[in-house]
Amino acid sequence: MTSVVVVGTQWGDEGKGKITDFLSADAEVIARYQGGDNAGHTIVIDGKKFKLHLIPSGIFFPQKISVIGNGVVVNPKSLVKELAYLHNEGVTTDNLRISDRAQVILPYHIQLDQLQEDAKGDNKIGTTIKGIGPAYMDKAARVGIRIADLLDKDIFAERLRINLAEKNRLFEKMYDSTPLDFDAIFEEYYAYGQEIKQYVTDTSVILNDALDAGKRVLFEGAQGVMLDIDQGTYPFVTSSNPVAGGVTIGSGVGPSKINKVVGVCKAYTSRVGDGPFPTELFDEVGERIREVGHEYGTTTGRPRRVGWFDSVVMRHSRRVSGITNLSLNSIDVLSGLDTVKICVAYDLDGKRIDYYPANLEQLKRCKPIYEELPGWQEDITGVRSLEELPENARNYVRRVGELVGVRISTFSVGPGREQTNILESVWASI
């Protein structure tokens, strides 16, 4: 068996879609294991950008199976829209498989998400208002509706009626909000279920059979480790587990079948939404990185917060996700800077620490300790090997690997497939 997990090591938007697309060339099955349409990934093929939110990046390889696993929360409306988008672009989706155990996002989840966020006022989390959190809440409360339920007219009607009655009481009594109509939701979403029915199956069987047959399986995470509900900057996190361990729960594949974990990061750091960000930049350098790196959310369109590379964050991600290989993206964005900085540790109340505090009040007091390196002025977007990089850029790449403590397998100097450079084949090393 041969399997590789791709995880984001920062706060999402690290370029996982691109690296997954790149690694998919040598995989036979590509599976997503958590999150929902709150995550966005951009793939560039022959200069054309494709933006996806639910469907795995592997969909662009028609001969390979693409899986939406049981750990994903699926908005059928968004999924049908994304399928239509791909079909209009001439992309076949016959290779898509959707877990019958995946949870369904319904309109009351989205309305509740908005109401809860508004009620928090200044303490808002910065949610994408996609209904992700409320859907996972229902899953944990054992009242969620699964894809298998959506396809059964009687079961869907019964469970929707019960859930909607409870949610409407909540909307009216607690939030003084408008109740939702059962008939409208039932008719619309049952129809969506029938549209996606052809793709639905027990995906754990597909994945385990593939691994047992010696096929190469690639698991694609959404968001990033620092948004993990257990290991991230709680409560400013998502509602699932992007860490590599989330694969086993979200796909139905046991931990003994995972071989490699590729951590994806940018040569700097970015974050969408609220929450701690020790190396955040508020000056013209930060603005320059944001504009050159096109740092605006794929899902929200919001400007991303940007900062220097944080090796404290990266070592935390390496530890909790068991990262074996590193993919360093967007090195080209730093071109033109006289100096570049890497955070090597924090100063907490006068004491140097090299771990990421769980206590947010302590984290607010952490000041980054930087190591400065000379920058480079050259345009590196056409570089196709480590040796072709300017010396200062090459030294930067090597220093990142040293500080994180993981060997760098690939580095990227732009968004295109051809701009990803291999230092070590992840598949060949298994």
Swiss-Prot record:
Similarity annotation: Belongs to the adenylosuccinate synthetase family.
Note accompanying the cofactor annotation: Binds 1 Mg(2+) ion per subunit.
Binding site for IMP: D13, E14, G15, K16, N38, A39, G40, H41, T128, R142, Q223, T238, R302
Lineage: Bacteria, Bacillati, Bacillota, Bacilli, Lactobacillales
Name of the molecule in the record: Adenylosuccinate synthetase
GO CC, one annotated term: cytoplasm
InterPro entries associated with the record: Adenylosuccin_syn_GTP-bd, Adenylosuccin_syn_Lys_AS, Adenylosuccinate_synth_dom1, Adenylosuccinate_synth_dom2, Adenylosuccinate_synth_dom3, Adenylosuccinate_synthetase, P-loop_NTPase
Location of the protein in the cell: Cytoplasm
Cofactor: Mg(2+)
SUPFAM superfamilies named in the record: P-loop containing nucleoside triphosphate hydrolases
Gene3D superfamilies: Adenylosuccinate Synthetase, subunit A, domain 1 (3.40.440.10), Adenylosuccinate Synthetase, subunit A, domain 2 (1.10.300.10), Adenylosuccinate Synthetase, subunit A, domain 3 (3.90.170.10)
GO annotation terms (biological process): 'de novo' AMP biosynthetic process; IMP metabolic process
EC number of this enzyme: 6.3.4.4
Active site: D13, H41
Subunit text: Homodimer.
Domain of life: Bacteria
Biological role stated in the UniProt entry: Plays an important role in the de novo pathway of purine nucleotide biosynthesis. Catalyzes the first committed step in the biosynthesis of AMP from IMP.
Pathway linked to the protein: Purine metabolism; AMP biosynthesis via de novo pathway; AMP from IMP: step 1/2
Residues annotated to bind GTP: 12-18, 40-42, 304, 330-332, 412-414
Reaction catalyzed: IMP + L-aspartate + GTP = N(6)-(1,2-dicarboxyethyl)-AMP + GDP + phosphate + 2 H(+)
